[in-house]
Amino acid sequence: MINTIFCATGYGNGAKIVAVEGSFHRGLPSFNISGLANHSIQEAKHRVQSALQSAQIPLPPMRFVLNLSPADLPKSGSHFDLPIALLGAMQKEILQEEWFAFGELGLDGTLKHQEGIFPLLLEIALQRRGAKVILPKGGEEIFSPIPNLTLYFASSLQEALEILKSPPPPIERKGLEFESIEILGEKYYYTQDFDFDFSEVLGQDVAKRVALISACGMHNFILEGSPGCGKSMIAKRMRGILPPMSLEEMIECVKLQALGNQSISYSPLRPFRSPHQSASKSSILGSATSLEAKAGEIALAHRGILFFDELPHFKKDILESLREPLENNCLVISRVHSKIEYETSFLFVGAQNPCPCGNLLSSSKECRCQEREISHYRNKLSEPFWDRIDMFVQMSEKREGSVGLSSREMQEKVFEVFKIQKLRGQKNFNGKLRAKEIAQYCILESECFELIEKMQDKFGLSFRGVQKIKKVARSIADLEGSEKIKKSHLIEAFGYRKI
């Protein structure tokens, strides 16, 4: 007779569901755990035996065999105590339903609250909607808001066993109290609380236009200009105008908050990560060992914005390492005993001065840099890196002019384009479309093909460069409500290309 209770273990910036299988067999009394369980799980034998004894459910004089499946996945965490103990207690009964259980046991059978299981629960909410989960008491305030799960809380092994045999009514949960729009039967959540507003950025109409197009399609862009011209101002205001979030995306972002040791808040605001230029490569990319994986800034920016201020001051190997996540929306870290894959679908924003002193484009200050210094400064960004950037704009030094669109007005335009993309059947934003999707959704008017050939011949555009221009043109066309991409849309998109 074999029973199975499910649990989970951390894996990259997510988690893997683990089936904990248990069975009793005739033979000399023993307690064996297989399936690449680390020391914290192997030590569970002693805690579980003591907890079962305290609950007056001693293990029978038989072989107790446990298998953690998949067997080739390394597993860790004392939260496996509870499912192991429950399987030890279910000696003559067969579970009829699928259950998840998490919790560390004391020797007296009490369950101990663990905040570290929070990201695991969020991953289960994404993978197994409606799953029944038993958790230790003490975490109600943190865990209860998690959607898609039916949660039960127990203070001891005995209580958990009673829940397993006769489930009480689940706890009541409040719904998400955010503004939302509904498209094709699915809700997308947003907020209009703007900590920073685009109305505060005077002038800079071209840069604000680029920011709007970028937000519509999640296009990567770089701003160049003299110190104080408003590069960082624009980057910090991008977060407020990004597309609304689905429930699944919100869960992913809350999970990233937990992985990044941030305070937990359920919010439709997308992540905004801005590492310092002195940050190490492992803090940017993340790290992986056979026992532990730590998400870096790239992974923590998933579904949001990754902002590199003073871009050329970052180490060259870090900048080159961005090429894979910018191209494939994922990052694979391979080590001798481990291989971790992080999802990295983010909007990259870079800001840089035109030269080391910053005054090259200034009309009032003299540049103090030599030619070789400027050349070395600009060569920090390679051609393959630039090829992955959708838009580039040089900002003027003047900070005067009209107020232009506010963040609320820009957000409304972004939402209109977001709705167009969803009604068109797109699963990805315009800026994240794959080659097949570009052919399907980036439909060009007949006069555009000749223009593309001329641009390729004259400027030597790569295939990737042409695809980038098409995707930006798609967002521009959506802003104008045009079903097909027109010549004017391509010309504007090409104007933002770094040649």
Positions of PLM-derived features:
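Hydrophobic residues in beta-strands of the RecA-like P-loop NTPase core, especially within AAA+ ATPase
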Residues: 102, 154, 301, 308-311
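Basic, amphipathic alpha-helical bundle interface domains used for macromolecular binding and assembly
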Residues: 34-45, 60, 67-77, 290-293, ...
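Peripheral, non-AAA+ core regions of ATP-driven protein-machinery
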Residues: 1-222, 229, 483-487, 491-493, ...
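Walker B catalytic acidic pair
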Residues: 225, 303, 309-311, 321
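Hydrophobic anchor at the beta1->P-loop junction of P-loop NTPases
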Residues: 223, 308, 351
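Conserved alpha-helical scaffold flanking the Walker A/P-loop in AAA+ ATPase domains
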Residues: 212-214, 265, 269-271, 279-306
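Walker A/P-loop
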Residues: 221-262, 328
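Residues immediately C-terminal
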Residues: 107, 306, 313-314
